[in-house]
Amino acid sequence: MAIVTSFRFTKNCGAICVDQESWHVWRRKNWFTDHLYSLIDPDQATRFGVELVYGGVGHPPYHLEVAEKARKLLREHLSRKDLDPAAVTAEKLGHVVLKAFQQVHRRRVDDKMEYLFGFNSDELNAGTFTNCQGTFPIQREEVKSRALKIVHGEEDTGYGPLTPPVEACLIGIDRHYGFSAFCLKEKDGVLGFQSCWFESLGQGRQGPAIRFAKLLNQRFLDSRRQGIGRDRGVFYLLDAISEAMDHYGQDGGFVRMMIIDGDAESATDRLRDIRDNAARLCVEIVKAQRNELLDRETAVDLMTDLTRPEPDIDAVESRFFKAVDDPMRLGKLLRRYKIEEPGLPEQGPEPRLFQADAVQTGAVREGDAS
């Protein structure tokens, strides 16, 4: 996958968004948004008031394995009878995820060394390896040198030559500290705390960083601490992702976003998964606003409706096109036409869908109705 970005909206609310596009042999493209995982079982999340969401960049199977292993470890951890609820925080649970992350890395390293040399990292440290014929010392310097390169990450463990580094962003909420976010990187093997509003990893991470930096530099310290709010935060998060989609390679596929809200009363409201058509329409709304076809407040209102449980996507899309002065121009933009000059497209669905409605409401400019 290409990029993952997290953003804190308020003290108790935030989101994580992925935009994933992969390509093979420089030509074939695949779009997928699978590498965003909710890690806590719903019943345990309700009991302890926590949520944890994991999103990664780099080698896709790595993150799938981490998520499955982390879910198992977290389920066992939260099922302990002697567990103090006061000790259940996003940071504590993050270290459980880190353990799963490290175990997957260690397995991949050991698998490659077992395949190449017949010994694992423990045997490399001991200087001896054991097989069915007995125990033998590891003596060849070229073998030890290459094995150490694999352990240190200087040689890949089965990734493609164009795969970005394996990195992940982890966001969570708990009853004690509210929203927290962390970073995990395969080359470091530590859990890094997100000390500012945002984190961006992967291809094109500079784009969201620039957009968020401009936003934060305009705000006073108290305003930063208070947060920007959930509804506006969703807009700015997707605006930052759009910056990467517009200007950086390997970005531009479908997006998927998970919103976690510590102030929500129900499990449905506490974790919101925005995907497929709703996510696509959100990106189109942001694109219209970035091209000055839609004002920001209207864009925020439309996206707020799209991020509610079971949104009426068709109704929101209809409101979206009616909110712009020139729906035909908007249609050209969304179909990737050049829109330097205004005017109606000769072909396309916009005249049929929106011009008739405009005639009925008297909104068509003179000459356009004909």
Language model feature labels by segment:
Residues M1-E154, G189-F235, D276-S370:
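Conserved short S/T/G-enriched processing/targeting/catalytic segments and their helical context
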Residues A2-R8, C13-C17, L162-D174, G178-F182, ...:
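Short beta-strand scaffold segments in enzyme catalytic cores
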Residues A45, Y159-P161, Y248:
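Sterically constrained small-residue positions within well-ordered secondary structures
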Residues V151-G202:
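A mid-sequence, solvent-exposed acidic-amphipathic segment
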Residues G227-V234, E243-I260:
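Flexible, glycine/charged-enriched surface loops at secondary-structure junctions
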Residues G233, D269-R270:
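Extended charged low-complexity segments that act as oligomerization/scaffolding linkers
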Residues S242, D263-S266:
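Short Gly/Pro-enriched loop/turn and capping motifs at secondary-structure junctions
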